[in-house]
């Protein structure tokens, strides 16, 4: 008999009466009145093994095994006795009567119990190998595998070709910092790890591969959050001779296919499409969570002439905004709740949080409870109540500041209230999956510090045809042929139609204050390629880590990556990054500069 004939979790009634050979780890060992029970675990699940003292040698071995010992057992599959069936296990109706037990490798005492759900992330990442044995991590990584498989299946069927692009490439500005790799052979010069395969996949379209994809690592040296890692995985795609709508349809179908085949979820037959300007106006975010049934009310124009400077000053500012968020039944919120929300919005730059409770709308001013009502005229109060559609028992929150502060703070408050216990109890958040496309993004953003425009996405995105004329006259008016797929408040994919004509690409570089010499130095290979009959093309990249995180219901993408980094970009398992030998630095022509010591 081979070392293993079955997986533990797959031993069921179909093997009754058969002798099996199993390998795995001891999840738990229990001694019940002279009979030893072992819960044996492998990647497919658990099976109960019964060790009877009638087999003395085997029983002696069983007495010595402990949790996480790696063992092999051979035994007979039989029904569990009446009253001992475990309906929570796939193998819960049977057990294996052990005939032979071999310890393949002993284990020291683990630093934690694998069924402990209250471990710190530091402990889990330091002992990641043990953490990966936990059923939830096994599930997450197998789900990740299935998502990748289904993405490949779909793309293969649609005629896409899997092509690898370089990992050692040229440093080009794409927003975040590059991870640099010094060249030993070319002293003083550096490769960069790719932030994306963006330029190479465009070159593949010029090279007539028509449809490309790869599931690939990308690298960005940026501050980390729950949904960010210094190295992450993209489902990266590019296609020729399709327009923006056709590209969206193609990849919308892919996401529907992946969700249906991996977690049996039917996403909407057609994803809604929302312009960027509408998303910001209604939700203060370009990745709105449509499950939350709360929206902004625009008040900027109505507050321009009020005496209340907190509202009128930003209402009259060039980049100011005044907006309201009506919360149905929010009158139930206590002053402590409101104070907590006030402190919360300060995180996003808000100076405070104005509010009005609507107790009896019919009474006008006298039916309202608020510290700001005394500063507003009756006409302004009436306008607020009418626009927000407030009813008795509601509360209205206000934000008045620079538009970015209003959007960030009120947008975060919308999500916090919507997903709170209060929000759930009052129907302010829906269950399920709410996908959408956000389109018509600004082509450029203005950087006040550098006094120039920067690319909102990347400088290879095509402007909308009707906005080409603005590239040289008014870049701020340009909208891009860019699109993001958003799901439950997460951007899971983003892409665009690309610039395929050299003269348009050069105009974009000029709008970004990238001169001809600099453009040739950094992007000459692209500009040259575009002159050889480059086809119209576009694409998209999906964050595999994010998609799997959402499907798994995990708190962080670190829970769906085998060996992730911390939020300080450290690997606690291998202790990377780490110092290197002076000899290695000399070979790379690198000398470390000691950090300056603070002055006494």
Curated annotation (Swiss-Prot):
Belongs to the class-II aminoacyl-tRNA synthetase family. Type 1 subfamily. Pfam families: GAD, tRNA-synt_2, tRNA_anti-codon. HAMAP family: Asp_tRNA_synth_type1. Its EC number is 6.1.1.23. The gene is aspS. It comes from Burkholderia cenocepacia (strain HI2424). One of its GO terms (biological process) is aspartyl-tRNA aminoacylation. The record marks 32, 83 as: Important for tRNA non-discrimination. Aspartyl-tRNA synthetase with relaxed tRNA specificity since it is able to aspartylate not only its cognate tRNA(Asp) but also tRNA(Asn). Reaction proceeds in two steps: L-aspartate is first activated by ATP to form Asp-AMP and then transferred to the acceptor end of tRNA(Asp/Asn). SUPFAM superfamilies: Class II aaRS and biotin synthetases, GAD domain-like, Nucleic acid-binding proteins. It catalyses: tRNA(Asx) + L-aspartate + ATP = L-aspartyl-tRNA(Asx) + AMP + diphosphate. It is an enzyme of class 6 (ligase). Keywords: Aminoacyl-tRNA synthetase, ATP-binding, Cytoplasm, Ligase, Nucleotide-binding, Protein biosynthesis. It comes from the Bacteria. Residues 198-201 are annotated as: Aspartate. ATP binds at residues 220-222, 229, 491, 543-546. InterPro entries: Aa-tRNA-synt_II, aa-tRNA-synth_II, aa-tRNA-synth_II/BPL/LPL, Asp-tRNA-ligase_1, Asp-tRNA-ligase_1_N, Asp/Asn-tRNA-synth_IIb, AspRS_core, GAD-like_sf. This is Aspartate--tRNA(Asp/Asn) ligase. CDD domains: AspRS_core (cd00777), EcAspRS_like_N (cd04317). Homodimer.
